[in-house]
Amino acid sequence: MKKLPVCDISYIQVRFLPIYLHQIIEKVNTKNQIIMKPEHLTVDTFKEKVFNYEASKDWKFEGDKPAIIDFYADWCGPCKIVAPILEELQEEYGDKLNIYKVDTEDQRELGAVFGIQSIPSLLFIPQEGQPQMAMGALPKETFKQAISEVLNVN
């Protein structure tokens, strides 16, 4: 059995640690507060956290707080305008709401389920009631208005 130097083992541990932490938090500010960023969803995490469309055709939100889902693509110019706004909103509202992102190029099934034909498309999901879809690069004030009026989050 070949012995590995301790530094090689720690390299392996450190190498994979940021990948895991990236899924939970993105950065820490100067006051050592955790700053959350929008979470990227796959088909499986979507079914778990938002709506299991295979189990039921009737809308049943699986989340524990209101959410916004950004259906986007990396090559989309307007999507690149919306991305930093959503990051600011996630930081501003913290754990009062969840902001998720769905890459329509990687998660084509989710785009098809919601009939996404233009991006960005944004799904506003209140804790109770039906979700509402908006399309296009919305300004921050419009997001804040929808968060207040549709999601009932202040």
Where on the chain are the PLM-derived regions?
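Non-catalytic, surface beta->alpha helical segment in thiol-disulfide oxidoreductase systems
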Residues: 118, 123-154
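N-proximal helix/coil linker or "cap" segments that precede and/or mark the start of modular domains
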Residues: 28-44
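A short beta-strand-turn-helix
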Residues: 41-67
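Short hydrophobic targeting helices and cationic amphipathic motifs
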Residues: 17, 21-23, 33
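Short pre-active-site segment immediately N-terminal to redox-active cysteine/selenocysteine motifs
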Residues: 64-67, 71-75, 118
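Thiol-based oxidoreductase modules, predominantly thioredoxin-like and allied folds used
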Residues: 40, 71, 83-90, 94-109
